[in-house]
Amino acid sequence: NMKLTKINYNILVYLPDDIETMKGQNILADDFNMGAFSVTVLENMNAKDILKLEDKIRDIDGVAKVITGYDALGTEIPASILPTDIRSKLSKDNNDIMLITYNDATSADTTLNAVTKVREITKDACKVGGMSAMLLDTMDLAQREITIYIVIAVVLCILVLELSLNSYLVPILLMLNIGMAILYNLGTNLVFGEISYITKALVAVLQLGVTTDFSIFLYHSYESKKDKYKTKEEAMTEAISETFISVLGSSLTTIAGFLVLCTMKLTLGKDLGLVMAKGVLLGVITTLTVFPVLLLYFDNAIEKTKHKSLLPKFTHLNNFVIKNHKIIFTLFIKIGRASCRE
C-alpha cells in the first residue's frame, strides 16, 4: 500500500483557488492551452547546434513548443545586429535562453518525464529551470534524505531511552512497536489516494515524537504491577487498562490538534492533519496490542538486560521546585508578560 500511495510533489495544488496565483494559472491553462514551461540556459553553443537541439527536444513526448531567438534569426544572421537591450535578454556571455512549453500541467507525469529526457539529451550543455524541474529536484532530494534523518531520529531516540529506561532491550522493542505503527500509517494513506511529499517527509519523525510516551507509560505501569500479581499476564492486563485510561485524554487532544489543521485554507494542513491524526490513533492501538505482546514474549530477556538508571534522580531539583514554587510561579508570570510586550 505504501508503494501504491501517490506522492504529490506539486505544492501549488494545495493553494486555494481564489488567490491570484491560481487564477493566473487557470487562465493560462483554460484560455491559452498553456501547460508547464521550462526556461533553459544553453552554454557555449552555436546557432546551428541550438537549432538541432530544438528539433531533438520537439520530438520528446509531452513537449508542445521550443523557442529560441534563432528561430527568427536563423543561422545566417548574427545576433550581434540586434539592439543591445533585446540581445541581452536572449544571449549573454555565450549563454542563450531556450523556452520549452509542455502539453500538460507542471506536476503531470508526462511533463516530468519530458523534463527528464530534456536533461538526458542536453546533459551538461544546458541548465533546465522552472517549476517542473524544481519538482524533479525536490523528488530526488526528498527520496535520498528521508531515510537518512529517520535513521538519525531512531538512533537518537534509542540512545535517550537507553539512558532513561532500566533495560537495554526495552528501547529496541519500543522502536519496533512504533515502527510498526508508522508502517501501518504510511500504508493506510492509500485511502486518501495521495499525500504531499512534505507529509511523507514529516510523518515518521512526528509520529515517533508524539507517540513514544504511550509505550513508555505502559512499560512503567507493567513493571510496577509485576510484584503485585501472581502472573505477568495479570500484571499486563492491569497495565493495559491503566495505560488506556491515562493516554486516552492526551491522545485525543493530540488528535484534535492535528485535525484543527484541516481548517487551513492551505489544504496542505488537511493533508498533514489527517495523516498525523491517524498516526496517533494507530500509535495508541499498537501500544495497547502489539507492545504488550513484545514485552511478555521477551520478558526473560528484558530481566537479563536490566541495569541501573543512568540518569540522575534530580532530587535536589525536585526539592528546590517544591520549596520555591511561589517564586517560580511569579517569575513565570513576569517572563510571560515581558514576552507579550515584545
Task: Label every model-predicted segment.
Residues N1-Y9, V13, T106-R341:
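Membrane-embedded transmembrane helical bundles of large multi-pass transporters/channels
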Residues L15-D18, M22-K23, A47-T101, L136-D140:
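Extracytoplasmic
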Residues F32, R58-A64, C126, K230, ...:
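Structural motif
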Residues V39-E43, I97-T101, K127, S215-F217:
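Soluble periplasmic/extracytoplasmic beta-strand elements of cell-envelope proteins
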Residues L42-N44, Y70-A72, G130-S132:
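A general secondary-structure junction signal
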